[in-house]
Swiss-Prot record:
PANTHER family: CROSSOVER JUNCTION ENDODEOXYRIBONUCLEASE RUVC. The gene is ruvC. Keywords: Cytoplasm, DNA damage, DNA recombination, DNA repair, DNA-binding, Endonuclease, Hydrolase, Magnesium, Metal-binding, Nuclease. This is Crossover junction endodeoxyribonuclease RuvC. It comes from Polaromonas naphthalenivorans (strain CJ2). GO terms for cellular component: cytoplasm; Holliday junction resolvase complex. Belongs to the RuvC family. The lineage of its organism: Bacteria, Pseudomonadati, Pseudomonadota, Betaproteobacteria, Burkholderiales. Binds 2 Mg(2+) ion per subunit. It comes from the Bacteria. It catalyses: Endonucleolytic cleavage at a junction such as a reciprocal single-stranded crossover between two homologous DNA duplexes (Holliday junction). The keyword Magnesium applies. PROSITE patterns: RUVC. Mg(2+) 2 binds at E69. The RuvA-RuvB-RuvC complex processes Holliday junction (HJ) DNA during genetic recombination and DNA repair. Endonuclease that resolves HJ intermediates. Cleaves cruciform DNA by making single-stranded nicks across the HJ at symmetrical positions within the homologous arms, yielding a 5'-phosphate and a 3'-hydroxyl group; requires a central core of homology in the junction. The consensus cleavage sequence is 5'-(A/T)TT(C/G)-3'. Cleavage occurs on the 3'-side of the TT dinucleotide at the point of strand exchange.
């Protein structure tokens, strides 16, 4: 299953694609979508670049699901609003491509990838490189996006299995119910 991670940003949006085959993860691609070539006052133009860029990534790599970082209020409310609009353009591109979208906080991603929620950017980059056996460090934005894809591979698929078990009356693969083996 191909999982697309998106780290939204108005100037630079990171993307990362991993393939999950059972418990194994394999790097597929990563990169950035940049709007820095546009005038900072051209917000609609920047949002269109993000929308089109995310759609292009989806068409190229054909993911089955996407994982996007949740944005929280920063010290600067204007920056938070702009980031929220960038995030909205990315999510709109994903859902218009008929993708399910999972959302995770930066803390959840850092905890899933590095083992604790206060990990710095460099630690996330190092762990992404190790987990995906990359030959070199990915860029910060791409590393965060890959981290979001990894987070969904670990957390999201486990949550989906629990939901399916709940719908099936608490049974998981017919071997377990309420935590006890039968």
């Amino acid at each position: 299953m191909h999982i697309l991670g998106i780290d939204p940003g108005l100037q630079i949006t990171g993307f990362g694609v991993v393939d999950m085959d059972g418990p194994h993860l394999r790097y597929v691609a990563s990169g950035t979508i940049k709007t820095t070539h546009l005038d900072t006052k051209d917000l609609p133009g920047r949002l269109k670049v993000l929308f089109d860029g995310v759609r292009e990534v989806v068409q190229r790599y054909q993911p089955e699901v996407a994982s996007v970082e949740i944005v929280f209020v920063n010290v600067n409310p204007q920056a938070t609003l702009l980031l929220g609009q960038a995030r909205g353009a990315c999510i709109t591109a994903l859902v218009s491509s008929d993708l399910a979208v999972a959302e995770y906080t930066a803390l959840q991603m850092k905890k899933a990838v590095a083992g604790y929620g206060k990990a710095g950017k460099a630690e996330v980059q190092q762990m992404v490189m190790r987990l995906l056996k990359l030959p070199s460090l990915p860029g910060k934005d791409a590393a965060d996006a890959l981290g979001l894809a990894i987070t969904h591979a670990h957390v999201g698929t486990a949550m989906a299995r629990l939901a399916l078990a709940s719908e099936a009356g608490g049974k998981m693969d017919g071997n377990y119910r309420a935590g006890r083996s039968r």
